[in-house]
Amino acid sequence: LRITLQWIAVIGLLGAAGPVRADYELVLKKNCLACHQVDKRKYGPNFKEVAARYADQKNAADVLGKKIRRGGTGVWGQDVMPPQPQVSAAEARALARYVLSVK
């Protein structure tokens, strides 16, 4: 019984990681790492900084998803987020969900 419960816990953790893993694969596919990193500054803010900035915003995934598609300026000083029109609304939300999950 104990081993069965351990396997159930492991399977549950793997299942929970599934969407985040898929979202990270989208980060790679959409070339987000050309300008951003998980925990180091490159050209734009790193994912941890973004997650911290939007942490208390209840509609953060929607706001960030729109920012990904439309681009923007002024949020991170002189940094410019160029628009990404090739990213669909659903993909932008998935990318935002991943970025916001980074701690």
What do these predicted regions represent?
Residues V99-K103:
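Short hydrophobic/aromatic patches at helix-to-coil boundaries
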